[in-house]
């Protein structure tokens, strides 16, 4: 079915539309009160340059019907999180204040401090502009609710609990001293506390305490009683602090050309406690209302705290739908307001002035960085007699540990700056044993073969190639590139420690001055690819270390393996289990249980099948 026919068949119904390019990649996700009117509008009449560029890449589209606009907005946000489409507005953190993070996606969630809010399923609370207030909050939380703070992911079973468990600050799920349901109750209580739902929390704690007492679980009831008293004390203090003000976020943004910056002031108890800002990508050509709507959806879908009132410098598109969505996320009413007078208008003007100032400062810094990078590239071109300015530079490195799990990495700089989205990593497939030269040749042959095959991830060829190593690695690289018919690309090797630069055709190294901007950019590129390779290699080692004999048993996938380890605690304990013990594990059947026994050298009748006495 061609696009015209699909457009003609669009329903007049709320939903989400998904635009695909010729490669099938998702390039834009949007929501609409009427899919028919909204999607057809892209292919009718004139649009802003960015929208026209997006439409020119649309080869196909699909849509999902929803009951109403709020449901469409929720689905739109989830799909944007999942696919990160090229033409949707996105926020890029420059810096942020610390948040409290609760890893709710884990079986036994942890509480942590973090400065980055990512889409990992965790809940985030904050930001905290005062280190003192953050420490006080954490101290209070750890005293009230004993949930774990360790870094184990996944949770590693232990025979004995840690010190925190002995002093009553952890329920010790690692030692099997608490079940998931009880632990989740504690986590839910923490979330209610951080959300400020103190009345609901007091009620919940009372009910849990009374239920524990009715079951004659007096130790648990006493712990809940102490938590209840502490929460009630905190509530009384906060009532006094909150009596003079209210909680709100104040949001504005500034734009200049393609650059845009969003700024949020956090007002708690009637006082501005801090701010956070984000750079907006993909906002050019959009109206101010569209940008504000995108900013709200992107920021609050991250799992951050949502106050009861959000003050806005510009009226967002679909304000009523966004307010309903935010209210659903918060679990209470959220008001979106564009003040016209009074102190709240003054606050928003201040936020906007700050946004303009921050954007100007950012643009000035970026211009200076671009000028510095260009000067370094010009110096590099002159010193090395390069045929053209090395705008795209690629570096390659090989990493291995005692000859095992060799990996390769490619880092990319464009105009002297890192371009992480273009970084690539390679698992070495054809080389056995430690052989950096052969591994490097495999990586380069795969990279340039992909370019010849028009793979969009490798389509852009470099103006300059840097190899982490000396003459040996350099010759291996050039040999491969010539065999691939790549053509002339200036290729150099940068040796560590003495920082000598090698080129093909001479054994005499080039020694650049230590203060040289050209050397500094090469060092940065070399160090970046080395870091990327080491990180990938470490991840592979950790993944290999977590493997066990269970991974080789048919029918035991990640989910079943997790259930087995949760039930028994370790592979050693599983090896002592009987068929009946295994069948007690959630999701287990007799066939797989028998395979596990066989894989562990046991028979289903309980006898050892190894033939040992």
From Swiss-Prot:
Residues 12-89 form the GIY-YIG domain. GO terms for biological process: nucleotide-excision repair; SOS response. Keywords: Cytoplasm, DNA damage, DNA excision, DNA repair, Excision nuclease, SOS response. SMART domains: GIYc, HhH1. GO terms for molecular function: DNA binding; excinuclease ABC activity. GO terms for cellular component: cytoplasm; excinuclease repair complex. InterPro entries: GIY-YIG_endonuc (IPR000305), GIY-YIG_endonuc_sf (IPR035901), GIY-YIG_UvrC_Cho (IPR047296), Hlx-hairpin-Hlx_DNA-bd_motif (IPR003583), RuvA_2-like (IPR010994), UVR_dom (IPR001943), UVR_dom_sf (IPR036876), UvrABC_protein_C (IPR050066). Its main location: cytoplasm. The keyword Cytoplasm applies. The keyword Cytoplasm applies. NCBIfam families: PRK00558.1-5 (NF001824), uvrC (TIGR00194). The UvrABC repair system catalyzes the recognition and processing of DNA lesions. UvrC both incises the 5' and 3' sides of the lesion. The N-terminal half is responsible for the 3' incision and the C-terminal half is responsible for the 5' incision. This is UvrABC system protein C. It comes from Moorella thermoacetica (strain ATCC 39073 / JCM 9320). The gene is uvrC.
């Amino acid at each position: 079915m061609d696009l015209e026919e699909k457009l003609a068949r669009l329903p007049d119904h709320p939903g989400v539309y998904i635009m695909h390019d010729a490669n099938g990649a998702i390039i834009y996700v949007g929501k609409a009160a009427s899919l028919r009117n909204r999607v057809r509008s892209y292919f009718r009449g004139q649009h802003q340059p960015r929208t026209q560029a997006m439409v020119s890449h649309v080869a196909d589209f699909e849509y999902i019907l929803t009951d109403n606009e709020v449901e469409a907005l929720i689905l739109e946000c989830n799909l944007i999180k999942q696919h990160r489409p090229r033409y949707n507005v996105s926020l890029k953190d420059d810096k942020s204040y610390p948040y409290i993070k609760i890893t709710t996606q884990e079986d036994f969630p942890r509480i942590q401090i973090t400065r980055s809010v990512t889409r990992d399923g965790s809940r985030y609370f904050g930001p905290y502009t005062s280190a003192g207030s953050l420490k006080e909050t954490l101290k209070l939380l750890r005293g009230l609710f004993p949930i774990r703070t360790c870094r184990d992911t996944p949770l590693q079973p232990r025979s004995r609990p840690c010190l925190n468990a002995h002093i009553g600050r952890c329920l010790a799920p690692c030692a099997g001293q608490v079940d998931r349901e009880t632990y989740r109750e504690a986590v839910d209580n923490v979330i209610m506390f951080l959300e400020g739902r103190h009345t609901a929390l007091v009620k919940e704690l009372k009910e849990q305490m009374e239920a524990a007492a009715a079951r004659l679980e007096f130790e648990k009831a006493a712990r809940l009683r102490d938590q209840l008293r502490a929460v009630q004390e905190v509530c009384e203090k906060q009532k006094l602090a909150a009596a003079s003000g209210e909680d709100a976020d104040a949001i504005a943004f500034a734009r200049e050309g393609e650059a845009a910056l969003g700024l949020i002031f956090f007002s708690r108890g009637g006082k501005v406690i801090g701010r956070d800002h984000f750079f907006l990508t993909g906002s050019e050509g959009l109206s101010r209302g569209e940008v504000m709507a995108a900013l709200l959806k992107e920021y609050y879908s991250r799992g951050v705290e949502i106050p009861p009132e959000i003050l806005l410098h510009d009226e967002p598109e679909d304000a009523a739908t966004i307010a309903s969505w935010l209210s659903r996320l918060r679990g209470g009413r959220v008001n979106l307001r564009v003040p016209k007078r009074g102190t709240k208008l003054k606050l928003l003007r201040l936020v906007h002035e700050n946004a303009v100032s921050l954007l100007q400062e950012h643009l000035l810094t970026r211009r200076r960085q671009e000028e510095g990078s260009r000067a370094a590239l010009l110096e590099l071109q002159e010193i090395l007699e390069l045929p053209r300015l090395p705008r795209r530079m690629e570096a390659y490195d090989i990493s291995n540990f005692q000859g095992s799990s060799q990996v390769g990495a490619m880092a990319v700089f464009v105009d002297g700056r890192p371009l992480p989205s273009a970084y690539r990593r390679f698992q070495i497939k054809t080389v056995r044993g430690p052989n950096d030269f052969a591994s490097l040749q495999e990586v380069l042959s795969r990279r340039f073969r992909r370019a010849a095959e028009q793979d969009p991830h490798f389509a852009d060829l470099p103006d300059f190639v840097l190899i982490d190593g000396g003459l040996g690695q350099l010759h291996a690289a050039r040999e491969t590139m010539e065999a691939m018919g790549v053509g002339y690309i200036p290729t150099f090797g940068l040796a560590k420690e003495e920082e000598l630069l090698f080129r093909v055709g001479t054994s005499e190294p080039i020694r650049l001055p230590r203060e040289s901007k050209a050397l500094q950019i090469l060092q940065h590129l070399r160090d970046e690819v080395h870091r990327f390779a080491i990180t990938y290699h470490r991840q592979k080692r950790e993944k290999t270390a977590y493997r066990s004999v269970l991974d080789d048993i048919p029918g035991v996938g990640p989910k079943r393996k997790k259930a087995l380890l949760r039930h028994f605690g370790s592979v050693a304990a599983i090896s002592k289990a009987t068929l009946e013990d295994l069948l007690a594990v959630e999701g287990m059947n007799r066939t797989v249980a028998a395979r596990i026994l066989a894989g562990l050298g046991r028979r289903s009748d309980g006898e050892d099948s190894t033939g040992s006495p």
